[in-house]
Amino acid sequence: RRGTVQHYFSGAVRVGNARAYKILIVAVLICATVLTMIVVNSLRFNPDPSRDQDFIARAQQKSVPGIKVKASALGGSESRRSFGENLGKYGIQPIWLEIENETDDQLVYLQIATDPDYYSPYEVSYRFHGIFSPAANLARDAFFLKRQIPSVVQPHSHSTGFVYGEADSGIKYARFVIVGSNRLETFDFALSVPGPAFVGTGVHADTIPRDQKVEDLDIDALRKVLTKISCCTTNSDATRLGDPLNLVIVEGERDPIIPFIARDWHLAQKLDIASIVETARAFIFRDEYLTSPVSPLFVFNRREDVAIQKARSTINERIHARLWLTPYTFQSRRIWIGQVSRDIGVRLTDQTWNLTTHKIGPDVDFDRSYLLQDLLMSGFVERYGFVGGVGAATMSDPRRNLTADPYYTDGLRLVAFLSNQTRTLGDIERLPWEQPPAPSDEAR
C-alpha cells in the first residue's frame, strides 16, 4: 500500500511538472511575442523627412498684401515616408502649409475652413499605437504634434507645418482662411496629388495645336461663336454623333477646376489596367469608385482634356462632365466647351470592348441644371446665360448617343463665367440671352 501511495504522489509530481513546464513555455512565448511587438512597433516608426523638399518644391503660392501662403498636398508614398506610417490606410492626408505674416498684427489660421473634419495630431498618432510599446507611442505623439502647423502666426514671422485632413486623389481642394485685426483673407487652392494618372491634371495652353490660332472675342462675338460650335461629341473618327455639348465654362483668374472640386467633384482616372481592375472590383461588389474612368469622347479631333464626376455610393450611378479647351478666349480668359450627363445604371451593349456601358438619364437638361446649381452654390460664378447650338430633341423623338441611349433636350448650352472673387447668389448676373422653355406637357 505504501508503494501505491508513493507511486501516486510521484505520478502527481510528474503531471504537475509537465503542467508547470507547459505554463512556462506559454509564458515564454507570450513574453517573446510581446517583446517582438515592442521591437517591431519601435522599428516600424521610422519617419524620413529628408525628402520633404519633393512636395515643398511643387507647393503652390498665393498672396495678398502682407500675407503669403504656400501649400502642397502629400501623396500616399510621400506621406508614408515623411511620417513613418501609412496614413492613407485610415483615409488621412497631410497638407503642408507655410504662412508668412509681414503685417504688424497677429494672424490666426482657421484649420476648420480647410477641412471641417480635420484630425488632431494625437488622433492620428493613436491609430498607430502599440499595446506594449509606450516609449514608441510617446515618440509618435511628440512627432505628430510637433509637425502640426500652429494656429497663430506672430507679426513679421512665418509658420510651417501640416494639417491632417481627409484623403483625396488627383486634385485636392484646400481653402485657407486667415483672420487678423479687422481683416479676413481667403486663399483657394487646387493642389495636385501624386498617384494614379488622371484626365486633366496637366491641361495647359499647349493643349491647343500650335498651328491653330487662338481668337479673342468680345461678348457679342462670343455668343455667336458658341452657337456655331458642333452640336455634339463624336467617336474617334468623327463619323457618328454622341452626347450633346451642353456646357461652356469661361475661366476667371482662379484654376477653373476649383468650383467643381469645392463641390465634391473628382477628376476621373485615365483608362488603364489599374483603373479597369478597380472598376471591375467596384462593379462586382457594388462599391463606390469616386474617380472611375470615363469612356473617351471627341471634340476638335481629340478626346476630352478634363473629365470630372460626382459619384453616388455605387459605381453604377454618377453625374459626369467632359471638357475641351477651345481655340477661343474671352477678354484673354480661356473658354472650355463640354457635356454633362448622368449615369443611372449599367446595361449590356455591343458598342464597347467589355460589352457593358453606363446608361445615361434621358433628360440631359436636368443634369445641366444640376451642374449650374452646383457652380452657383460654390460662389465662383459671376454671371451665366444660355445660347443655342445643340438643337432641340423631344421625348417622343429623342436623339441617341454613341451607345444608343436616347436623350432629349431644349437644345441650349449653359455658359458659366467664373469669377475672380467669391459671390453670393444675389450678386450673380443672369445674361439676357436665350431662356430655357417651361416644361412641356410631354415632359411633365
Model features per residue range: what roles?
Residues 37-43, 117, 147-210:
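Surface-exposed edge beta-strand/loop patches
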Residues 105-113, 175, 257-261:
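Short, hydrophobic/aromatic beta-strand segments
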